[in-house]
A protein has these predicted regions:
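Membrane-embedded transmembrane alpha-helical bundles that form the catalytic cores
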Residues: 1-458
């Protein structure tokens, strides 16, 4: 595909080719749902132009913005949240003694709908704010919404980053292509050798919580923390690498999040594209921290409730978002009333805060992984009250799992705190080649290969 892209020569032909390839890629899941991407594209592109042309009429300008938001979020609500809210309303009515049937739709959730909806909506808002100019070329804009490397699981790109790159004439650069391949190789390692290996234990335990004790559930929760990180960050690396081979640079989505010393820092390092999107389009419009203190805390909580709902139509995701919101509220209050004493900057203290932050994140992951709130509460109860025995599995699992996690942590420590390149980025070509061959061999020998999809495809 990369060869065809560069052989096409003229940029207009390349962009048209990438657009066709992106739609073909998406239609492999459910062909009919490509119409949803096209609808979102046409609506946001048209509204962007109309918003810009209504610069002298604020009421008209805001009307086109609202129309874009209503249509896009309306589609998202219909496919992702209608059944959730219908079931919640039915449960509430039943609790009040009212027997009223609320119809459910039971429609198949379109892959990646939350990602491309947020990306398209962000474009319209940016045009409204005057941050960017409206894109005149429909094909270029359509590719921005549907660019296949990041279409189904992000990162949620910004128009100011990606649109200019589509207008540029890219020439093949071996060094760029090599960097892209290295990113893809590392992403595949994270997925196959850490995430999918850990998933074997995690699924066995979490899918049968009543038959497992606290020890197994605690280990499964810690392994899930690495599973979800490597699954999502692995895809982000593969997406960034695929784009890089053609000369495009996607935003960095993960920055060694498990070496954060606070929850605030964690969210600057975890799913950066979503956290920055929520900051710019939810938190700041609510007033951010430029409002009275209690409202500031409320803004934090609302933003993280939105983050939870973005991840899925289930009360477990709402609880996960609420927990992170509560963490941020407590941190913010501590900083307000205790100042630097609450979060000392001394290196030794900071290092001690890293495992505490990781433990808090892992506690929240329980609600993210559990299939219901009752199951999540059962997991919490068993971890803190019923140690039990560790679920037995073969030695090869622990060898592959722990070695994979060790390599991951070594790289993250080097990227976070160290200086100088690791083996894949060594200035010596022979070392780079040996590292790439070794990592490929590891993936082929110890990777878990099967039909397990990326976790974030469901969002």
């Amino acid at each position: 595909m990369v060869a065809v892209y560069f052989l096409l020569g003229k940029n207009s032909r390349r962009i048209s080719f990438l657009l066709a390839a992106s739609y073909f890629f998406y239609m492999n899941w459910e062909p009919a749902y490509a119409a949803l991407i096209l609808t979102s594209t046409v609506v946001t592109w048209s509204c962007g132009l109309l918003v810009e042309r209504s610069a002298g009429n604020e009421r008209r300008k805001k009307g086109f913005l609202i129309a874009s938001l209503a249509i896009n979020f309306g589609i998202l609500f219909f496919f992702k949240y209608f059944d959730f809210f219908a079931e919640s309303v039915f449960a509430l009515l039943s609790a009040l003694g009212l027997r009223m049937q609320v119809p459910g739709l039971r429609v198949l959730l379109p892959v990646g709908i939350s990602f491309y909806t947020f990306q398209a909506v962000g474009y319209t808002v940016d045009v409204y704010r005057g941050t960017i100019r409206a894109e005149r070329n429909f094909v270029v804009y359509a590719l921005f919404v549907s660019f296949f490397p990041q279409l189904v699981a992000g990162p949620i790109e910004r128009a100011k980053n990606l649109l200019p790159q589509f207008r540029e004439e890219h020439s093949f650069r071996p060094a760029e292509a090599a960097e892209g391949l290295k990113l893809m190789l590392w992403g595949l390692f994270m997925k196959a050798c850490v995430a999918d290996v850990a998933a074997e234990f995690v699924d066995a335990v979490y899918d049968n919580v009543p038959n497992h004790g606290g020890a197994s559930l605690l280990v499964a929760t810690i392994l899930f923390a690495f599973q979800v990180y490597c699954d999502f960050a692995g895809y982000s690396c593969i997406a960034a690498g695929a784009a890089r081979t053609m000369g495009f640079r996607l935003m960095e989505n993960f920055r060694q999040p498990y070496f954060s010393a606070s929850i605030k820092e964690f969210w600057r390092r975890w799913h950066v594209s979503l956290s920055s999107w929520l900051t710019d389009y939810v938190y700041i419009p609510l007033g951010g921290n430029r409002v009275p203190f209690l409202r500031h805390l409320a803004n934090l909580l609302v933003t993280f409730l939105a983050s939870g709902l973005w991840h899925g139509a289930n009360w477990t995701f709402v609880a996960w978002g609420a927990l992170h919101g509560l963490y941020l509220v407590l941190e913010t209050a501590a900083r307000r009333f205790a100042g630097d004493a609450a979060f000392p900057r001394r290196p030794a203290v900071r290092i001690l805060r890293i495992p505490l932050c990781f433990a808090m994140v892992c506690f929240a992951w329980i609600f993210f992984r559990a299939d219901s709130l009752s199951t999540a509460c059962a997991v919490v109860g068993k971890i803190f009250g019923d140690r039990g025995t560790l679920f037995e599995t073969n030695a090869s699992f622990w060898l592959c799992s722990l070695l994979g996690i060790a390599v991951l942590l070594l790289k993250d420590v080097k990227d976070r705190f160290g200086k100088g390149p690791l083996l894949l980025h060594s200035p010596c070509g022979a070392v780079r080649l040996a590292a790439a061959v070794g990592l490929t061999a590891w993936i082929l020998l110890f990777g878990a290969f099967g039909s397990r999809a990326f976790i974030y495809f469901q969002f």
